[in-house]
């Protein structure tokens, strides 16, 4: 098992990014934005960010057109460069 290097809790605003996309694309873009946000803040590549299914289900909970306006997640970075994301 890899050793935990950093553990942080983030509140990610989604509303300001999702308003620019058509309604039918918003949940998909929100999920991609969460990955991009965490890769930037945890200083890893986007493919090294592993998002828990609970986070994805929370984004898609109200359908593709109405993702949540913000989401609170816990990100854990391991010494091998993998970041695991779960709901906080």
Curated annotation (Swiss-Prot):
Gene Ontology terms describing biological process: cytoplasmic translation
GO molecular function: structural constituent of ribosome
Signal peptide: none
Record Pfam families: Ribosomal_L31e
PANTHER family: 60S RIBOSOMAL PROTEIN L31
Alphabetized NCBIfam families for the sequence: PRK01192.1-1
Assigned protein family: Belongs to the eukaryotic ribosomal protein eL31 family.
UniProt protein name: Large ribosomal subunit protein eL31
Species: Archaeoglobus fulgidus (strain ATCC 49558 / DSM 4304 / JCM 9628 / NBRC 100126 / VC-16)
């Amino acid at each position: 098992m890899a050793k935990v290097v950093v553990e942080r809790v983030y509140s990610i605003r989604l509303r300001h990014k999702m308003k620019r996309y058509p309604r039918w694309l918003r949940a998909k873009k929100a999920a991609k934005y969460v990955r991009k946000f965490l890769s930037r803040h945890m200083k890893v590549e986007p493919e090294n960010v592993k998002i828990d299914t609970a986070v994805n289900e929370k984004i898609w909970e109200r359908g593709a057109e109405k993702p949540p306006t913000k989401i609170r997640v816990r990100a854990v970075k391991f010494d091998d460069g993998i970041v695991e994301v779960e709901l906080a």
